[in-house]
Amino acid sequence: MDKDLAFLTRCSNEELGFLFDILTKKGSLSEFITTSPEYKKYGKDYRQYVELLAAEVQDFGSNTFWFRKDYHTVAKAACKKSGASCNSSDSTEEIESKMLAHMMGKAWEKLSEKDKNVFIDNCGYCGGDVCTFLVKKGASKFFDYLLRDGATASYQTSLIIANAVTRQTLNRGISFAANTLSKPLVVSTLAGTTAAGLTLGRLASVFAGPVGWALTAGLTVLDIAGPAYRVTVPAVAYIGCLRNIKKYQGKR
């Protein structure tokens, strides 16, 4: 298995199930998982054939451009196709983070001034750290910091994005995020305190529409290059979220 996807062996069947559905439902014309002996034997016990899921991500090829040797290359191409900038020297985690932050940044741009103010006011930092950071650095940088926080903020933000990706791609959210989405948002990178009055559920509701719009717009454009992008972009985004989730859980 590709070293950058080895962490998938630590994921639950529920977590892997969403990746399976992205690969098989969005790539229904060219996926090979559902015809494999492993799938026929184990069905929804995805942990039994996680290597097959990883290989499908790497080799997914509705057009020959997408036959890649390693996940880093696939992630880099998906990142650039999403509109985010990355370099070959970036680690896989950095590439995923830049892609996810870009998605959230584009969502922020589409928010009304009212919704932006709701976000800032609920954070309790208007005139403080978050407000100043957003003005000086921009939304993409802000969410990049949250994703790289390595603590609760990264975990919670990743759950929000994963929930948005699966809702947009599969028309259903991630059930394993339900409890966390009701807890207060912790922005430890910037202030080290709990954002007063802001829950992930409220924040998710603010970003659900714009993030969905960003993904829809991106996937519409990607149709021009070939249907493989409709799979690899949400797959890489979801994998990036899973990586942050497992990293956080591993520290507890």
Ranges and model annotations:
Residues M1-L159:
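Terminal export/targeting leaders at protein ends
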Residues I33, V50, V57, V74, ...:
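Extended aliphatic helical segments
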Residues A162:
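Glycine-rich anion/phosphate-binding loop at the beta-strand->alpha-helix junction
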Residues L170-R252:
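Membrane-engaging insertion elements
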Residues G124, G128, T132-T152, T166, ...:
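Solvent-exposed flexible segments
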